[in-house]
């Protein structure tokens, strides 16, 4: 069985948040590893890289069927992961991967998710992320 989440983010929204709140926004939303990874991106693509990671966090939360704390009011009472509970990191080959902790990891374990795949893309205006979660039902 597969669970899928996708999210689209306007790069300008992330740029505006960084310009307005600076390091406070960056530290609240992104882990130290994510911030460091985006810092090595060429200056012209830094906001796109940040927006793609934001989209990945949202897409992963959607695939897991949970919300993200700090992203507005929810009318349904369900688990909400912290923004640092879903981390976008690179593997040895440079591909984006997801590292889960906290509520996100607990939910993935409860759903018996065996693997997560993330794909990121962006233009200068939009960033998109797609997350597929694979559940092995062969033992059921």
Swiss-Prot record:
Gene Ontology CC entries for this record: cytoplasm
Source organism superkingdom: Bacteria
EC category: transferase
Cofactor(s) the record lists: Mg(2+)
Cell compartment(s), UniProt: Cytoplasm
EC identifiers of the protein: 2.7.8.7
Chain sites annotated for binding Mg(2+): 7, 58
Family statement drawn from the similarity comment of this UniProt entry: Belongs to the P-Pant transferase superfamily. AcpS family.
Functional summary from the UniProt entry: Transfers the 4'-phosphopantetheine moiety from coenzyme A to a Ser of acyl-carrier-protein.
Name this protein carries in UniProt: Holo-[acyl-carrier-protein] synthase
